[in-house]
């Protein structure tokens, strides 16, 4: 009987050890392949990569609506050149609640707005540039699309996110890397401090020339640190 109990305990111990060892072989967020790793080993390691709790929660949202709305809506262009007259932005029946309500009924869980695209036109009354809704005739320059969408998301219990283009074809300081990075961080700070909780921030890698013909070196680390500090 004692031998049987000893064998059972040994078996349980070995199984527990094997399970613990197996659990340790999972990788969270990222995995680094050793230089000597074979293709088979890389495939095996990649198959054991699991998301972080934050990444898993993002996947569970399933559907996000990306609202590509801005001054290009009124010029009919995909990418503006930053020379648009703000007077062109004058929506007569903008109804953010109708947008969000429709998306909610369709099963979406988050709404993400292009607060600024490559043309540099801002959908909120930013202090960083005159190329914004504050210079438009919409609501006599007192309108704020970001604010209206944020309020609609609160009303319908939808998560809210913003897209802010690093490439800015209107900003004179674009291409002067330190100055423009500071300019961009000030815009990002406005969005992350004046509109409550922002559940997602989108950038992209577009890096064309600015109005001065120069390209910008983006300070991605500073951008991400700003997000982490404010949200």
Give residue ranges: language-model regions.
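Bacterial Sec-dependent N-terminal signal peptides
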Residues: 1-23
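Mature catalytic domains of secreted/periplasmic carbohydrate-active enzymes
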Residues: 21-231
């Amino acid at each position: 009987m004692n031998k049987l109990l000893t064998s059972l305990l040994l078996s349980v111990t070995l199984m527990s050890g094997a399970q613990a060892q197996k659990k340790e072989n999972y990788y969270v967020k990222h995995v680094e392949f050793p230089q000597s790793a074979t293709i088979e080993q890389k495939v095996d390691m990649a198959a054991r990569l699991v998301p972080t709790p934050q990444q898993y929660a993002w996947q569970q949202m399933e559907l996000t609506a990306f609202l590509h709305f801005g001054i290009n809506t009124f010029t009919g262009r995909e990418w503006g050149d930053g020379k648009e007259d703000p007077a062109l932005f004058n929506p007569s029946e903008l109804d953010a609640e109708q947008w969000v309500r429709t998306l909610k009924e369709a099963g979406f869980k988050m709404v993400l707005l292009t607060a600024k695209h490559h043309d540099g036109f801002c959908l909120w009354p930013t202090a960083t540039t005159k190329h914004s809704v504050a210079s438009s005739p919409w609501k006599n320059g007192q309108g704020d699309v970001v604010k209206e969408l944020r309020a609609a998301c609160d009303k319908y219990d939808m998560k809210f996110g913003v897209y802010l283009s690093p490439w800015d074809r209107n900003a004179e300081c674009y291409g002067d890397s330190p100055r423009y990075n500071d300019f961009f961080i000030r815009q990002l700070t406005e969005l992350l401090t004046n509109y409550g909780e922002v559940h997602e921030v989108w950038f992209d890698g577009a890096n064309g020339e600015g109005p001065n013909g120069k390209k910008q070196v983006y300070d991605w680390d500073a951008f991400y640190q700003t997000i982490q500090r404010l949200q």
